[in-house]
Amino acid sequence: SLLTPYGLPAQSGGRNIQNGLGGGVEPEALKQGTPDPADFDVYWKKQLEALAAVPPKLLEKKLVKESNQCFVYDVKISCVGKRPVSGYLSIPKGAGPKSLPLRVWYEGYGVSSAPIRENPAEISFSVNAHGIENGRELAYYKELEQGELHNYGLRAAGNQKPESSYFNNMILRDLRALEFARSLPEWDGSTL
């Protein structure tokens, strides 16, 4: 909460005023806390090769919303691992080839649908971190959160090797999402 000069929460209309803000002094002086593992570059080269071995195929593109400004599609794209890339792709109406900037949104780690984002001045792709279905009922996400995805990043067994870490495939889905988005014919080819 925002504080008054007296250290009390500032209010407006009887409610605390809250906002987020970050800052840093000499951020360029920040140093890495631990060194990269000796095989870091070799490991990621191997992971990128595995990703490249799976052709980036559009598995599903379903129109879920049409507004005055945009078409919104629920898309799924092939990827390594057990889940595809999933997300909402919003393309402004009347977009011509190479006419628009691109914004890719990586939507945190919560077990939920990616949000629909519409902007008539850009292509927007909201990527679901888990590659799960979007736009489903709350019970679907609760079941995943309490079951299969419960403590997904904190499981000791899954974190014994980098290959079995949950975040390995999450990162590869994010990279595939970017690869897909950059292949869209409406993207201007430079503004990302």
Language-model region placement:
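Non-catalytic propeptide/linker segments at domain boundaries
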Residues: V25-D41, Q47-E49
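The conserved beta1-alpha1 loop
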Residues: S90, P101, Y106-E107, N128
